[in-house]
Design a protein with these regions (language model features):
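Alpha-helical transmembrane segments and their membrane-interface boundaries
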Residues: 1-198
Length: 198
């Protein structure tokens, strides 16, 4: 998702590393039986911290002093974009869909429970992110970020395919059918960008 927000590929990999570590940490905490909402907050906290550390590393003097080939691979012109994308694995898309579906099917009580669950997930996620931003002393980094599509469509197509297949693996989608989701992601993102550009 980071590329879809306008970052470069180096920042995309930084966001992916942070998200993978946060996801694995949350999964491990779930396996040992700790509170699910606390696990979401901890996963969001560590994913955000790691994304911030990688972004700061990419702009540090340590990277600038490396040989040119290494520095060009590690430096990013968009070090803040991973902070926006590293916790998207926690967004409760399925619970939101289930909430709306239950309410529309007149299963009001179940819908309310699922809606409250969704609010708690989002609150835990936001808590982890806010604590990480406070710990790092990050100012309002979004004031200078452009979210307008500016990459070629083929770049967005690749990023959309990777994103769609990545989310599908979270829900144990059959690997042989991932190409279908990749095509769906490509169509959705490129349509969104076409509409945004006018």
């Amino acid at each position: 998702f980071c590329v879809q927000f306008g970052c470069d590929w180096t920042a995309f990999f930084y966001a992916s590393i942070a998200a993978a570590i946060g996801f694995r940490l949350r999964t491990r905490l779930n396996e040992i039986g700790s509170n699910g909402y606390a696990n979401i907050a901890v996963g969001a906290f560590f994913a955000t911290i790691i994304a911030w550390l990688l972004g700061m590393f990419s702009t540090s003097a340590l990277v600038a002093d490396m040989p040119q080939w290494a520095a060009s691979m590690l430096q990013t012109g968009t070090p803040w974009h991973p902070l926006m994308a590293c916790t998207l694995f926690l967004v409760p898309g399925v619970p939101i869909i289930n909430f709306v579906n239950d309410v529309l099917d007149n299963n009001i009580e179940v819908g309310i429970v699922r809606g409250i669950n969704t609010v708690l997930i989002v609150s835990a996620m936001a808590f982890g992110i806010v604590v990480a931003i406070s710990v790092c002393g990050i100012d309002n980094f979004v004031k200078d970020l452009s979210m307008t599509p500016h990459h070629p469509y083929w770049v967005y197509a690749i990023a959309a395919a990777i994103s769609a297949m990545g989310f599908a693996t979270i829900y144990n989608f059959p690997p042989k059918q991932l190409w279908v989701l990749a095509l769906g992601g490509i169509v959705a993102v490129c349509t969104r960008n076409f509409i945004n550009l006018g």
